[in-house]
Amino acid sequence: MPIYKTDKKRDGLFLYTVRVNYTDKNGKAHGLTRTAVGAEAAKLLESQLTAEYKTGQITPAERMTVGELAAKYLAAKRTEVRRSTAEKTERILNRYVLPTMQKERLDRLNAQKLQDWKQSVTALALAPKTQKNIYGEFRTMLNFAVKMEHLPRNPLLTVGNFKDTDFTPPTDKLQYYTSDEFLRYKAAALADAETKGTLSEYAYYVFFCIAYYMGMRKGEINALRWSDINGGLLTVRRSVTQKVKGESAVETLPKNKTSYRTIEIPEPLMEILAEYKKRLAARDAYRDNYRVCGGGENGVLTDSNVDRHNRRYADMAGLKHIRVHDFRHSHASLLANEGINIQEIARRLGHAKIEMTWNTYAHLYPRESERSLSVLNKVK
């Protein structure tokens, strides 16, 4: 069972392929090839595959069930993606796919059975985006079965994805604060922090200022250390997830390769950070390796407390409530409305693909429509 080191990297570690060759009961030769990130993960995967082979857990395609496939798929995925990502996939499969499909044999999957499954999910009256996420996870798992030669093709592609029954204009979906609204929100947050007079309350004010001025993800802000700030530059090197089973908060790598980024800090935020640093130092609560908002080496602001403060600040400012992630939208929307190049916005957000940025914020470029009309009006 060989391990091969490739020349590709992910999150700074080399990718390895692990292969096991075996013969089924009919004498047909098969090969399973899986990928692991890093040498340690590759050795662990090799041990796992060896154990499965010796105990007969490697099941020929004609007898493998969806449940058995899910177990193998999740085991492989845990070696390739962040822990929180693997657990999200596991939750979706356990909740929406396996209850009705786990006993179905792969070789007996057909369009009717999969259409019945789709109808059962539709009956749950979930949001269209949630339905499509469920379909995507199931489709990816069956693609894995094709890759591992358990299926000749993916039968789910025949029935297709869920469709939107109603059309909602993008502007109705995207929630954000304008610059004027954020200034009201910011003033309310500062007033609340000053009234309570504690560093921990001031940290929430700083948290939302970073979210708006930098467009960073919630986990990236929680993982931010003072050593990540160098003059007018801030480098995103890590993230924190609070949705890992059995643990309150886990520091992880950023979401993707482009999430590693160095971005410029605007002057208003520089002043806020300088004042916060001054207050921390006055109480001997500042160290270079301390987290900016959570304090200490491993402190975090919990999701529930961040949400609670967010609602309070919005109420105090007389504003509609938006989600914490919508501060990231607010950052991008402000830049888009000012005509900033979409590629620059994608860079600041750390998007893996510029198409993601364009599809989300393209409608916020009103000046482009004015410019195009102006050009056409000259042709007369």
Task: Identify the function of each model-found stretch.
Residues 9-112, 278-287:
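N-terminal DNA-binding module of tyrosine recombinases/phage integrases
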Residues 17-19, 160-161, 223-278:
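Conserved tyrosine-mediated DNA breakage-rejoining catalytic core shared by Y-recombinases
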Residues 38, 62, 74-155, 193-200, ...:
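N-terminal core-binding DNA-recognition domain of tyrosine site-specific recombinases/integrases
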Residues 117, 245-253, 338-340, 359, ...:
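DNA/chromatin major-groove-contacting recognition/catalytic segments
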Residues 124, 187-201, 214, 263, ...:
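Short, basic (Lys/Arg/His-rich) helix/loop patches that form interaction surfaces
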Residues 132, 147-153, 157-218, 222-224, ...:
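Basic, Lys/Arg- and aromatic-enriched nucleic-acid-binding interface segment
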Residues 187, 191-194, 242-245, 249-260, ...:
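C-terminal secondary-structure termini that scaffold catalytic or DNA-interacting sites
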Residues 238-240, 270, 349-374:
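Catalytic-site neighborhood detector that most strongly recognizes the C-terminal catalytic loop/helix
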